[in-house]
């Protein structure tokens, strides 16, 4: 039986998911509704025509009883403004902007609503892997978890933290560290760049204790993430050197593919 899906957001990520569903790359899925904004109405109409689905610019008008799963692809604020409401009504939701869950109040609300409504919350692994090992090690006890992210300067331009601090990423001759702090602060400072920090922290020891370092490196052509963890079960390190997403230079190609993987996993009867 086909899974009826709605997508909130028709930017780079929403467009990618829409086209993947149309091409049959996400499993047995029917796209029921696309939700966009007035600013993106032309693109919204084009995508809806491609997918032969309904569209709206008002998230509150979604025919929720006809949808099995709602995918967020509209940013952290959309998680707070709309996805919690869908979850409260018992709908399964997928959150791509995982950085929103680094805020303790938001994460606790998601847990509360999920338990009450029965709605499942799906979090794609994004541009990293090894989260299964981190989850397992956390049960035994983790002392430290660290994420070191290095990206080409262009991938970090426009981030709120870069603008706020007046960091000049033009014509860099050498790698510079532009952020060091915990995953909670990283998710707020780089909402479009560092969802992996939130995902890692939720799998492990929490946003406040997960340490994050972000560097801009002019010699890189790939987005690089290195995870280091230490605990009662041992020491672990993972390194990912990801090609940039063709759809979004601020993200990795692996990140968008992880969404398709999560959609397929949701439809499976045998789970890894």
Predicted feature locations:
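Extreme N-terminal starter segment of soluble prokaryotic enzymes
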Residues: 1-6
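Active-site-lining helix/loop region of Rossmann-like oxidoreductase modules
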Residues: 8, 16, 121-122, 128-272
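Hydrophobic/small residue at the entry helix of a nucleotide-binding pocket
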Residues: 13
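NAD(P)-binding Rossmann-fold cofactor-contacting core
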Residues: 26-47
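A short helix->loop->beta-strand "cap" motif at the edges of active sites that frequently abuts
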Residues: 53, 89-92, 116-119
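Beta-loop-alpha module in the N-terminal Rossmann-like domain of NAD(P)-dependent dehydrogenases
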Residues: 57-88, 100-104
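Rossmann-fold NAD(P)-binding glycine/threonine-rich loop
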Residues: 98-119
């Amino acid at each position: 039986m086909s899974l009826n899906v709605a997508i909130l957001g028709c930017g780079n990520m929403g467009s990618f998911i829409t086209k993947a569903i149309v091409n049959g790359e996400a499993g047995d899925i029917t796209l029921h509704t696309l939700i966009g904004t007035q600013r993106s109405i032309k693109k919204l109409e084009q995508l809806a025509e491609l997918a032969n689905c309904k569209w709206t610019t008002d998230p509150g008008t979604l025919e929720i009883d006809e949808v099995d799963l709602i995918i967020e692809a509209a940013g952290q604020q959309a998680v707070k403004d709309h996805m919690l409401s869908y979850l409260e009504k018992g709908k399964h939701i997928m959150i791509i902007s995982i950085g929103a869950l680094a805020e303790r109040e938001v994460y606790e609300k998601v847990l509360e609503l999920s338990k009450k409504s029965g709605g499942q919350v799906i979090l794609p692994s994004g541009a990293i892997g090894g989260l299964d090992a981190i989850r397992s090690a956390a049960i035994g006890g983790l002392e430290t978890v660290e994420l070191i992210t290095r990206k080409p300067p262009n991938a970090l331009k426009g981030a709120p933290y870069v603008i706020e601090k007046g960091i000049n990423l033009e014509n860099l001759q050498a790698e510079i560290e532009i952020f060091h702090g915990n995953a909670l602060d990283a998710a707020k400072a780089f909402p479009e760049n560092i969802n992996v920090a939130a995902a890692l922290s939720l799998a492990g020891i929490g946003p406040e204790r997960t340490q994050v370092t972000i560097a801009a490196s002019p010699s890189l052509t790939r987005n690089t993430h290195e995870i280091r963890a230490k605990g009662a079960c041992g020491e672990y390190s993972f390194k990912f050197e990801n090609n940039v997403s063709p759809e979004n230079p601020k993200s990795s190609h692996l990140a968008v593919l992880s969404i398709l993987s999560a959609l397929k996993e949701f439809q499976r009867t045998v789970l890894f």
